[in-house]
């Protein structure tokens, strides 16, 4: 007697053929909707398949047809609503075009991304959409590109690979947001990110994420344009969990040379930063100004509402899926999609509370 709960054997084409009293080849043609088969045979095969709860072997089908009608999506942190919105845009678009989506989360780990890409290719996905965990170590992605497998990047680039990429100009919007804070009198502006590095940030160090590198570069450009020194000591990376985010926030907001404004690189960091500010008994914008990347519903419900950098993330997901489907179906490439992030000015940014009377005014510097 089989043990209770033992796994039931999958129903095969041979089982369906036997039940329908036809050959295996006839059953395969009827189930796959290809080749010549009589209407009587087709009806018997489909009835037998339904009675046996037959499910097609998608891997075998893809080996026969060369297509699985499946898209692989690899993102860094599905807990982050940023990627949730992007993925929704991808899946909505893929579904309309008749494609399924397999989603893999990497926790922004390159080794996990390498494994994810390998697994998805083993499952014979028709194409890949990837938010690269590293813009430097991209050998696995270059291999996919060289193989001719359709590939699209979302949110970040991967070095100088000639791959369609759906992302905003991070340096531009970071420069604009930093200039907004500088115009309000802030000079000590902290930037907090989850990006993992082996050492504290210093100018010129290689950063694995093009997105974070561009944001820091945009901040640096705004300071340079204003004739000011960029406070490298306030670029804080490795904020990988709630405790480290709170600890970093407390560090940058204490002492005589503390930060007077904080920029959070994503919504998850922002939640912990806001909590840490409240725990310190500070308020914004009176004690400290605050700005974050991405615009989520909760940012409008705080008091005051938070100033944010809004990105068209859902539309980026839609565009990524459309671009990949065009590649998979051999259609001509469209003009490169352009996406613009927007600085949404609400109530969490105000004048610098500690600006001294003898501190120099901003000066525009020609570059």
Where are the language model's segments positioned?
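Short beta->alpha connector loops
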Residues: 107-110, 131-136, 268
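Active-site-adjacent beta->alpha loops and helix N-cap segments on the catalytic face
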Residues: 136-145
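Bacterial carbohydrate/catabolite-sensing allosteric modules
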Residues: 2-5, 51, 92-97, 145-153, ...
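Short hydrophobic/charged patches on amphipathic alpha-helices used for structural packing
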Residues: 60, 114-117, 141, 178, ...
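Amphipathic helical "hinge" segments at domain boundaries
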Residues: 39, 43, 52-127, 205, ...
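N-terminal helix-turn-helix DNA-binding module of bacterial transcription factors
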Residues: 1-69, 361-367
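Short beta-strand segments enriched in small/hydrophobic residues
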Residues: 19, 24-29, 64-78, 188-205
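Short catalytic-loop micro-motif centered on adjacent basic/acidic residues
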Residues: 102-104, 127-130, 263, 310
């Amino acid at each position: 007697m089989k043990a209770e709960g033992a796994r039931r054997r999958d129903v095969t084409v041979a089982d369906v053929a036997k039940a329908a009293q036809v050959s295996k080849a006839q059953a395969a043609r009827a189930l796959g909707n290809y080749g010549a088969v009589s209407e009587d045979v087709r009806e018997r095969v489909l009835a037998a398949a339904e009675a046996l709860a037959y499910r097609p072997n998608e891997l075998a089908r893809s080996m026969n047809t060369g297509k699985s009608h499946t898209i692989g999506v690899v993102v860094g942190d599905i807990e982050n609503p940023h990627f949730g919105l992007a993925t929704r845009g991808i899946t909505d678009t893929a579904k309309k075009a008749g494609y399924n989506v397999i989603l893999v989360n990497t926790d922004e780990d390159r080794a996990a991304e390498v494994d994810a890409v390998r697994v998805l290719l083993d499952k014979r996905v028709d194409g890949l959409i990837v938010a690269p965990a590293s813009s430097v170590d991209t050998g696995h992605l270059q291999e996919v590109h060289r193989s001719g497998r359709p590939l699209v990047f979302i949110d970040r680039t991967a070095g100088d690979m000639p791959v369609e990429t759906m992302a905003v100009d991070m340096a531009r919007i970071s420069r604009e947001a930093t200039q907004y804070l500088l115009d309000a009198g802030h000079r000590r502006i902290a930037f907090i990110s989850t990006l993992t590095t082996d050492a504290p940030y210093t100018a010129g160090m290689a950063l694995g994420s093009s997105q974070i590198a561009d944001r820091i570069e945009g901040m640096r450009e705004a300071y340079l344009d204003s004739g000011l020194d960029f406070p490298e000591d306030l670029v804080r990376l490795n904020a990988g969990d709630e405790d480290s985010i709170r600890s970093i926030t407390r560090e940058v907001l204490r002492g005589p040379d503390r930060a007077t404004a904080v920029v959070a690189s994503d919504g998850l960091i922002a939640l912990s930063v806001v909590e840490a500010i409240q725990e310190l008994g500070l308020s914004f914008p009176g004690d400290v100004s605050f700005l974050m990347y991405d615009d989520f519903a909760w940012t409008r419900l705080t008091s005051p509402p938070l100033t944010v950098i809004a990105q068209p993330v859902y539309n980026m997901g839609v565009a990524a899926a459309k671009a990949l489907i065009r590649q998979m179906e051999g259609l001509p490439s469209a003009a490169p999609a352009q996406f613009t992030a927007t600085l949404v000015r609400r109530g969490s940014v105000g004048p610098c509370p500690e600006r001294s009377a003898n501190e120099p005014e901003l000066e525009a510097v020609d570059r």
